[in-house]
Amino acid sequence: VGSGALTLRRAIIVAAVFEFCGAVFFGSHVTDTIRKGVLDFGDDGFDKELSQDLMYGFMAALLAAAIWLTIATKYGLPVSTTHSIVGGVIGMGLFIQPDSVNWPKVAEIVISWVASPLLGAILAYVSFRIIKKVIFDHDKPLQRTKSLAPILALPTFFVLGLALQFKGLKGFYKNLDNNGIIEKEEWLPCDPAKYSCSSFNPFSDSAWIPLNSFLVALFIGLIASTILWYVLKKYQFKEEGYDGVERVFIWLQIITACYVAFAHGANDVANAIGPMAAIYDIASSSTGILSPDKVDVPIWLLLLGGAGITVGVATWGYKVMDTIGTKITHITPSRGFAAEFGAATTVLIFSMPFLAVPISTTHTLVGAVVGVGLAGGAAAVDFRVFGKIAASWVASLPVAGLGSILFFILFAGNPTNVAIVVLLSIIITIYVVIRADNVDDESLESVITSQPFEQFHEHARAVQKTVECMNNAINSAAKGEDPSKYIEETIALELEADIIKSKIQGEIGSGVRFAIGRDTFLHMLSRQDRIADYAQNVAEQLSFRTLFDDKKARNNLMEMATAVLETVDSYEKAVDSLKELSQSGFSNKEKNLLLECVREVNLKEHRADEIEAKAAAHVFSTGDDDALAAMHMYRVLQRMDDVANACEKAANAFLPSLSR
């Protein structure tokens, strides 16, 4: 959404569909009795008293995690559902039986807070640097994309195919194995508890990547590469240059985003409803004792989990989309694709037996977004936002853990207490939702899909129109005609430019992050707006009285107006070049082109200075008979020179971005 690949509404629909399908149709039908192995009660099994405590403990853990996730999502913090529930389980385990906590497993989870975002950032950084070097630095980026995209699609979709099987379809393969349809060892990475797991050879029994999964992933890669080649061959691009390149990456990003949503639904949702399956197992058991090993996950629980995540995405999902898509760094389709590919590759690596560390897809994706931002320089990343996100990750375990202890105490093993506490929690949550700020779809869409350089370009066009109207006013006055119409239009156009500027300032102030620093961008915007301000001053100066009645002086004035307009036109080309520079990931080629545009603006401004000096000299040499009119003509020339000078300063404000 932040890259503009999909509108907010369409993104919500796509995410909801793939999350739901992943959870319901490919989620695991069997789950561990103690989620992720963070609790270990020994090999003696569970007695009735312990099972009942665990049932209420799991209820408390789920409620605590749900409240924490609600609070975090309300403030747009992308926290891990799985880790929040694990935190709740750890808390209730400490309270019920302190020595039951498997601290080495907890340590693995804590390590994953650093390891998965870090690796995701590195892979996303490298991915985008390769895209930038191979495509954006090329003289003809669109043609380069058409020729290379099918080749790049093969390894990309091969990795996605493996990650989909090992992360998203893991539960599905286990279901088929339980039903005697397949042997899961032939499809999933080998289990370190059963094999040595030391071979890359797909034909080995201890292969990290089994032959079946390898062939399926290769088939997916070949099919995707072939389809992309055919589509690019037939598709008639309306966009040129970098816009056309981003059009290709929009397709790729949508596919990778669908994978992330599907894998999250298939794996993470199943993890989230694991404690609920344990509760159901205890409550439905005739003995009231928890199964010691595995429990079945009823289909209605998978439906419940899928429905829950669908509602979550459709209600407050936009808040997290806003944070990841706009507030961390500037995202385009190519950057978004690199981030999602980096995240998918990280998930694949951590699913290998030589690591086998439980990681969060959410944490990994955030790290990948930071990595893509760093590819454009440290200034492109808002580390304050990332710091808040990281703090929320660290807080997930203790907050959910303490919350589960509190709720477990309030439950007191009494179903009536459970009903009262849960009901009050639901009422409070609904109240918070109702009290949430109402957000208009259109304004929200514009904020989340906001592209600052697009808006900057829109403001530049408004400024250019203001100067063009000012030029018409000057020519009209110089010809002895009434310039009132053009004067009024100039003032109105300057007001429109101010409105656009204020809108941009408001959105930038709301936390949108992009390729250069916020202060630098606002300085550039302010410099650009002064061009329109000075054009308005020229128009107002014309309204004071008629021009100096001298033919050569008036011709000089029109020549000056033409020079000023040419300076503004050159500045507009520099703005176009700045936009291209941003789209290219600040490639060296576009830096050189922008530098040439800035030099051209400076040359045009110097030419305007020369004409202004010539025109002023003529006015002062011939204006003795009507000194007041001559002084008025000089004031008009000065204000016009201000417009040209403002163009020069606005263009020079682009230069710091060339040092990135």
List the predicted regions and their residue ranges.
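Alpha-helical transmembrane segments and immediately membrane-proximal extracytoplasmic
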Residues: 1-443
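Cytosolic, long alpha-helical scaffolding segments
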Residues: 441-660
